[in-house]
């Protein structure tokens, strides 16, 4: 199991921590979308952050979608994770590379820009719930921390990191989500905050072989306890049947136009790049069904 997420708790059971190694799933996304460095960093951090939220909040058949609606060159990022810890996502502009910051790191803040962060939860109720906050940083981890504080009133700390190699492949990807539970003292929170500040640069640490278990001990201490360890993966659940269902929602005139003028249709999944081709006959069958023939 290369990519996995762990859930841990401190000895006094008033801090909950999720840590993740997601190098392979971010690499899969990079390969599917052919993203360049800045686009990879934005997409990778969004994938990791959404998985951490899903791991903390979802159960059953629930799912969660993060939308990062920034005005930077990468444009919007859309990521959906399910309770089984599968994730899929895309950015609006795949081919964005920016000059490095003075410290040599990718300028994610500039790539994202200003705008809004939305989190939509489909908890199996009648209507999905959406929380929205302004993008306060653009680094994504800080924006998720702000979202959790403002929209969900949960004192949290989020760290996310993606290392992109010079050839645009993914060298490392990981992160954490720390949440205070009822009863956590100010002294404990300050002590834990100091530990987080003392952490090595996350991407370098993951490159050097740090595991989610190692990261948990660095944040919570050696006496912390691991509660769960679950595999995480990039997985798109698109299918030709789903796209046929989408075509059925179009107006009859639109389907007729596809048949008469385009002589078929090719639909491309934003999340994974899979292409689905529909022949004239298949489109005609969808139109006939729609018209009740």
UniProtKB/Swiss-Prot annotation:
Pfam short name (any one): HSP33
GO cellular component, one term: cytoplasm
Gene3D superfamilies: Hsp33 domain, HSP33 redox switch-like
Disulfide bonds: 236-238, 269-272
Compartment(s) where it occurs, according to its Swiss-Prot or TrEMBL record: Cytoplasm
Single GO molecular function: unfolded protein binding
Presence of the UniProt keyword Disulfide bond in the record: yes
Coiled-coil parts of chain: none
Family: Belongs to the HSP33 family.
Protein name: 33 kDa chaperonin
Name of encoding gene: hslO
């Amino acid at each position: 199991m290369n990519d996995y997420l762990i859930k841990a708790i401190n000895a006094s059971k008033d801090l909950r921590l999720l840590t993740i190694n997601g190098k392979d799933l971010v690499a899969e996304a990079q390969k599917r979308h052919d993203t360049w460095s800045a686009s990879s960093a934005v997409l990778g951090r969004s994938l990791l952050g959404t998985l951490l939220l899903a791991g903390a909040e979802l159960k059953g058949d629930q799912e969660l979608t993060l939308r990062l609606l920034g005005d930077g060159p990468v444009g919007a990022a859309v990521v959906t994770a399910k309770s089984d810890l599968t994730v899929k996502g895309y950015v609006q502009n795949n081919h964005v590379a920016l000059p490095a910051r003075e410290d040599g790191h990718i300028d994610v803040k500039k790539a994202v820009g200003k705008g809004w962060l939305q989190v939509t939860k489909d908890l199996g109720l009648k209507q999905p719930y959406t929380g929205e906050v302004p993008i306060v940083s653009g680094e994504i981890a800080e924006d998720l921390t702000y979202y959790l504080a403002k929209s969900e009133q949960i004192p949290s700390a989020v760290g996310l990191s993606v290392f992109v190699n010079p050839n645009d492949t993914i060298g490392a990807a990981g992160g954490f989500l720390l949440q205070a539970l009822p009863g956590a003292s100010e002294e404990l929170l300050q002590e834990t905050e100091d530990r987080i500040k003392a952490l090595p640069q996350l991407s370098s640490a993951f490159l050097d072989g740090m595991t989610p278990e190692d990261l948990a001990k660095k944040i919570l201490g050696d006496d912390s306890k691991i509660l769960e360890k679950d595999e995480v993966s990039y997985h798109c659940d698109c299918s030709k049947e789903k796209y046929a269902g989408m075509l059925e929602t179009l107006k009859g005139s639109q389907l007729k136009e596809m048949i008469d003028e385009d002589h078929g249709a090719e639909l491309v999944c934003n999340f994974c790049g899979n292409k689905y081709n529909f022949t004239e006959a298949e489109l005609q069958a969808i139109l006939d069904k729609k018209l009740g023939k």
